[in-house]
Structure formats: C-alpha cells, structure tokens
C-alpha cells in the first residue's frame, strides 16, 4: 500500500491526497459546466445539447421522488452531487500519481519507519476511494434530510417514527441510523476495490496483466458511472422521505 502524505493544522490531520483529489474534482466539474453553458441559444448546439441531456437525466431522478414543483428545488443539488461523484469516481481510473520518497519527510508525516515498508507515496487518487470522503458526504445528506423534514412539518416528522404502530419506533430508528452507513459504504467499497485491483494489475508483467488491466479499467468506468447514479438516487430518496407530500 502506498504512503499517504498528511499535514497537521490547528491540531487536526489532513490527508493531502484527498484534498488534491477533491479540489481537482470540484474544479473539473466547475470547468465542464462553465464550458457547456457558454453562449446558450434557442437552437442548442453540441455542447449545449450535452448539458441539457445531463440536466434532463438528473431531473428524471428528482422527478421520480418528488412532485414537479418540489423536485425543481433540488435539481441543482442533485446535479452537483451527480457530477462531482462521477468525476471523482473516474479520476482514479484515468490518473493515479505516485512518487518515490528517498528519505523521511516529517512535514508530510512520512517517517523512516514508514519507508521501511514502502517508499511509494500516493499523490493523487479518487477521493471517493477513501471512506472518510463518502462518510462525510452521506452524513451531510443525512443531516440535511432530517433538518428539511423538521422545517417542513415538525409534527409530521415526529409522527412518522410511530407509524403504523408505536412499537415500531426502535425499528424506524435503526433504519434511519443505517441509511448513512450503507449510503457511504456502498460507494466507497466499489471504488476502493476497483482501484486496488488496478494497482495490483499495474504491478504485474504487462504481457500477462496488460489485457486484464485495460478490461478492468473499462469496467471501472462503468462502475463509476453506476455508483454516481445510485448515490444520487439514494440521496434524493432519503430527502424525499422527509419532505415529500406522501
């Protein structure tokens, strides 16, 4: 396993690889949306068609969960979530940056003891291949869905925990607690496992692992797209359960 550079700030430790990957993912999404939405016209061209297709696709996700007026409020959120996770998932398939450390780097948390295990330092990977990122995103969606439900109808929010029977309260609580855990673990496990296998195949002899490597990279692109879709759908499901009319 490659070493991960870390920095300490205000008593907290930050993973440099994750910060680079997350910032790059966000910048790529920003740049893509900026380029695809320049010079909009009534008769859309190629770039505008691509953006409109993506918006229609995500609008279909929100429309499945909420009424038309309500779903429009969450379109920007769902679009941003889908694009960020999609780009973050695919970055590790396309780009993995590692370097060789020739000596300890205390400022990045790399010690001589670490170098005895390996001298390979990871500088870039998919942010979603780290469980801390997926837990943070799933946790934020979990908290927001509850706050949105309370803000819309405090009494209705509390009543759903005892429906259809009061003795189902513990079951509802377990269900709510398990949602962010499964939401985060599903995304992380799929992306992490894919990157680990890519690293293993990359270290092998090209004559034996070359074809399996390219085949798995192609499959990883498919998995990355599917997982971005699933994460966004589940996010909207959890929010719709709290703010939906039914």
Regions found by a protein language model. Name each.
Residues 1-246:
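Selective transmembrane helix interface/packing segments
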């Amino acid at each position: 396993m490659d070493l991960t550079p870390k920095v300490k700030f205000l008593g907290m430790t930050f993973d440099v690889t994750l910060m680079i990957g997350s910032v790059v993912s966000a910048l790529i999404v920003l740049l893509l949306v900026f380029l695809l939405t320049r010079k909009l016209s009534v008769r859309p061209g190629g770039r505008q068609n691509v953006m409109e297709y993506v918006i229609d696709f995500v609008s279909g996700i929100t429309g499945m969960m909420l009424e038309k007026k309500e779903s429009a409020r969450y379109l920007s959120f769902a679009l941003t979530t889908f694009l960020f996770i999609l780009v973050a998932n695919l970055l590790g398939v396309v780009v993995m940056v590692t370097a060789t450390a020739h000596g300890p780097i205390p400022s990045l948390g790399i010690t001589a003891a670490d170098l005895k295990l390996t001298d390979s330092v990871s500088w870039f990977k998919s942010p979603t291949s780290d469980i801390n990122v997926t837990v943070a995103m799933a946790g934020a969606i979990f908290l927001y869905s509850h706050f949105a439900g309370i803000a819309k109808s405090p009494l209705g929010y509390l009543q759903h925990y005892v429906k259809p029977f009061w003795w189902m309260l513990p079951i509802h609580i377990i269900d709510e607690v398990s949602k962010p855990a499964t939401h985060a673990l599903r995304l992380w496990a799929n992306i992490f496992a894919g990157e680990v296998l890519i690293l293993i195949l990359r270290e092998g002899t090209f004559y034996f692992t070359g074809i399996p490597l390219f085949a798995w990279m192609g499959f990883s692109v498919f998995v990355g797209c599917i997982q971005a879709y699933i994460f966004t759908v589940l996010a909207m499901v959890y929010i719709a359960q709290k703010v939906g009319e039914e």
